[in-house]
């Protein structure tokens, strides 16, 4: 269960958000400090499964063949085989569009080398190289897990953002999502919470409320 202060900040962000004619996301902004982000080992690059889900549609594309491809078609947004992967490698614009429109990629391990060859220069810089799928992994379970996953990625910037829910989720559920993210950062950063300057939560168009 999240700290009450986190839930209070979320409640204020939801209450103070102006009414819009679309469903807003709830986003978290994390400001880092005392880290040399020119050193890649100090950068944040984590996938976190949110206990209450993202509250949004998550686009997932799978690279697979045979039975795995057939099962993935039940739940993935798109499934591409080896031939389609090769075609994509020859169309830079299509590859970039796919990368920009997709939240997560999953791929059978046997295709990872070809993905690196054909799409590495497109997916790598975007932090979207596929999650490898072992032969005994259940592709449906992996996809369902990734639908509730967000990416924490700072790059060289001291401030990074990630979604933590949607405006029609409860403050308690959003706070639980934030709590999981902060715990992961505290565990992974060199000096834990001392490497976090400030944290804010806000809806898409609403005011930012300080969490920590």
Swiss-Prot record:
Keyword Transferase recorded: no
GO molecular function: rRNA binding; structural constituent of ribosome; tRNA binding
Pfam families: Ribosomal_L1
Gene Ontology annotations of biological process type: regulation of translation; translation
UniProt KW keywords: Repressor, Ribonucleoprotein, Ribosomal protein, RNA-binding, rRNA-binding, Translation regulation, tRNA-binding
Keyword Isomerase: no
GO cellular component entries: large ribosomal subunit
Family named by the database record: Belongs to the universal ribosomal protein uL1 family.
Physiological role: Binds directly to 23S rRNA. Probably involved in E site tRNA release. Protein L1 is also a translational repressor protein, it controls the translation of its operon by binding to its mRNA.
Quaternary organization: Part of the 50S ribosomal subunit.
Name of this chain's protein: Large ribosomal subunit protein uL1
